[in-house]
């Protein structure tokens, strides 16, 4: 199985810092970050540190949703760990690796709103820009492509998640 580079480690780092600057200048700042596990954890770690460098220090609460299991075809979304009562009245920044059809992000936003968040914004490392997506991201590091992506937290049946770049399997 060969891999093709889409975005290098250096390109990702520069883009994450630029995205943090954009978020830090927004009129409504988040006060809590909520990464979607497992795919969003690496991007989330980089983004919250970049935000701290911009003077935006966020509390962190994890949300663990699963939609792919061990295959490439999305299945029903299951919640492993949901939002806590600590997000009630808070401005939440949901962070995920990829926005494909948007089902996972849509579920996350619904759960967070139901838990009483004052506002919910979404940041993703890669937005595939699908016209049929059921969710939208407020902040996007990279756009486009319909490839099945790997690396930087995103996997193929549990493999390739720890790669320091975003690539695709060819």
Segments the model singles out, each with a brief description of its role:
Residues 1-170:
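PRPP-associated nucleotide enzymes
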């Amino acid at each position: 199985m060969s891999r093709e580079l889409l975005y290098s480690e250096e390109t990702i780092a520069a883009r994450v810092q630029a995205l943090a600057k954009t978020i830090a200048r927004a009129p409504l700042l988040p006060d809590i970050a909520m990464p979607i596990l497992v795919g969003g954890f690496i991007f989330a770690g980089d983004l919250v540190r970049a935000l701290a460098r911009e003077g935006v220090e966020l509390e962190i609460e994890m949300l663990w949703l699963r939609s792919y299991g061990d295959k490439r075809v999305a299945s029903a979304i299951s919640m492993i760990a949901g939002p806590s009562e600590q997000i009630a009245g808070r401005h939440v920044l949901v962070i995920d690796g990829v926005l494909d059809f948007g089902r996972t992000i849509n579920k996350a936003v619904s759960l967070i709103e139901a838990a009483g968040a004052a506002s919910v914004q979404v940041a993703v490392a890669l937005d595939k820009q699908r016209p049929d997506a059921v969710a939208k991201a407020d902040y996007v590091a990279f756009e486009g492509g319909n490839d099945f992506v790997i690396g930087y937290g995103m996997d193929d049946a549990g493999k390739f998640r720890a790669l320091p770049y975003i690539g695709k399997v060819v």
